[in-house]
């Protein structure tokens, strides 16, 4: 697996075949039992795994595409990441540039944003909406999750003319999130 990632990263460099990757949005290194994905230009240390959390989606897609065969990890990730509806959604909402560095969401960010979106769009009989909390560890991509969430909501709910307000509890977090939004040009 590591060799496949290294080769894919190497092949994007000037002395190899960068033209092959010119229009690619998502790249994947895989063998039967392991998969890692990234965007073009992503250094090896930032390649990551995808863990499908929508088991109904995965089960239906695997049944459709494999019909009776035992799926491998490669099969599961190919279906999870490259099902037509999913890959288009990932490209549209979940790839961004952070200070001119192309980034794609991690699976945790994707599924958190999808759940938040459902909650934001759902109201009770009096028009009230639920609130919620997403817990992230330090360095897990909270700022980028907020940027991707804002992008998703602003694009998905465009007819409603949504506004996004980010509230922080510390000046340092305020500076950090402001910088992240500015670097992604979503400010």
Residue ranges and their predicted role:
Residues 1-168, 172-187:
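ATP-dependent helicase/translocase motor core
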């Amino acid at each position: 697996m590591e060799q496949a990632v290294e080769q894919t990263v190497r092949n994007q460099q000037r002395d190899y075949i960068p033209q092959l990757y010119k229009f690619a949005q998502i790249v994947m290194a895989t063998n039967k039992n392991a998969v890692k994905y990234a965007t073009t230009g992503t250094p090896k240390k930032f390649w990551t795994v995808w863990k499908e959390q929508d088991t109904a989606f995965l089960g239906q897609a695997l049944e459709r595409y494999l019909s009776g065969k035992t799926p491998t990890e490669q099969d599961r990730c190919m279906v999870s990441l490259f099902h037509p509806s999913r890959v288009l959604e990932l490209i549209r909402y979940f790839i961004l540039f952070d200070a001119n560095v192309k980034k794609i969401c991690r699976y945790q960010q994707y599924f958190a944003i999808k759940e938040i979106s459902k909650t934001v769009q759902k109201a009770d009989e009096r028009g009230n909406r639920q609130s919620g909390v997403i817990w992230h560890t330090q360095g897990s991509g909270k700022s980028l999750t907020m940027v991707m969430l804002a992008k998703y909501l602003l694009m998905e709910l465009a007819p409603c003319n949504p506004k996004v307000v980010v509230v922080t509890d510390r000046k340092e977090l305020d500076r950090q999130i402001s910088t992240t939004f500015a670097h992604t040009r979503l400010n």
